[in-house]
Amino acid sequence: AQIRVVLRGDFMSPDGPIYDSQLYYVDILSEQWRGGTQASCSQIWNSFPDVGGPAPWLTTPDDPSGLYSAVSLYYLAGMLIANGEVDTSSCQDGGLVFGDELTASECGLDVAFSDVVEWQNRFDSDIILVANDTGVPAQLLKNVFSRESQFWPGIYSTYEEAGLGQMTEKGAETILLWNPSFFSQFCPLVLHQSRCDLGYGNITIDEQTMLHGALVTEVDASCPDCPAGIDLEAAHFSVRVFAEGMIANCEQVGRILNNITGKTAGELTSYEDLWRFTLVNYNAGPGCLSKAAKRAFLLGGPLDWLNIAARLEPACKTAIDYVEDISMDLSGVEPTATSWVFVARPLRTPTPRTFPTETPTPTPTITPTYYPGQPTYTATPTPQSYPVETG
C-alpha cells in the first residue's frame, strides 16, 4: 500500500500563531482498499491524483445530470436525418450537405437540434454507472465518445471502426492482451474455456483473430431492423467495454514508461499527464508514445505532457489536438482520425448477435471526410508494436 498525507492549513510559520485548524488530507493506494472506487489507473501507475481532486475532465459527477451537454454535432444530426428520425423536408437541401449523405447542413442541424441534444445525453446514466464500477472517469468517457463517434454507436461503410469509441480489431487486441480480467470474462463467450485458460498470449493467432472480430462485433450497435438502425441495448453495453479498453491502455502506458526508465509511471509525471499519455496511446498507438517518451528521456527532459508532445513524430502529432480537445470539460465537435485503420476492405455484414448483452464482471465490468463534426478515425494501439527495452 502507498499512503499520502498532506497538511492542510496555515503551517508555513511553525513558530508563529496558527490561524487554521490542523487538517490532514489522506490518500491510500492499495489493492485491499474497500472504501469505494479508487481513481482509475492510480494503482496501475502508482500515482495519486492532484491534492483536492483531479481536473474537471477526469471527474465523475454524482449523477447523470452532471454530464449534460448540448453540443452542435453535425455528423450525429446527419445520421439521425439519414435514418429517418428527423423530418427535414422543410430544408431546401433536404437537411444534408450536398454530396455527403452523412453530414447535416446548417438547416438540417437547426431542425434536428433537439433530437441531437437528447441523443448525446442518452448514454449518460450508463457512463456514470460504468465509471463508478471501473474508476474510469465519466467525463473522460463522454468526451472520448463525442470526439470519436459523436455518440453514434454503429459502424461506418468505409472504415473498420465500430461503436461509441470507434473500436478497430487492433483496439480489440489491446483490450484482450492488456486487460486479463476482461479477457477471462469475454473469451469463454467465443472459445472453449480450456483454450481461454491458456491466456491470450498462448492461444493460436487464428483464435486471437476470432476474438478480435467478436469483440468489434459486440460493440457494433448497427441493426438494420431497429429504430434509427441502432441496437440501443448493445450500445449501452458497449460503454463498459470501452471503459475496460481505457484500463488496458493505462496498463500499456505504465509498461512503456517502465521499460524506458526502469521506474513506475507515478514516479515520472503527474496523474493528469499519465491520462494524456493514455489518450495518445489510444489514438495514435504505442509506437508514437514510446518513441516520444524515449527521445525525451534520452535528452534528459521531464516526462511531462509538454515535453512528450514536443517529441512526437510528425505522423503522430494529430494526437496533440485529440488530447487537448478531450481534456477540455466538454469535447469538441470534430471527432478524430485514426491513422491505422484499413480502408477498402469490405466490412462484415451485420449478423444476429450471438453473445450475451452483458459480460459478467466482478466490479464493473473505441471517419470519413472532414466536414464540421464528422468522425474521422481512431488509432487504437497494437501491443505487439511497442518496443520492450532490455537492460
Where do the PLM segments sit?
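Cell-wall glycan-active module
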Residues: A1-M210, V216, D220-C226, R240, ...
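A short, structured beta-strand-centered segment in the mid-to-C-terminal lobe
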Residues: P227-F237
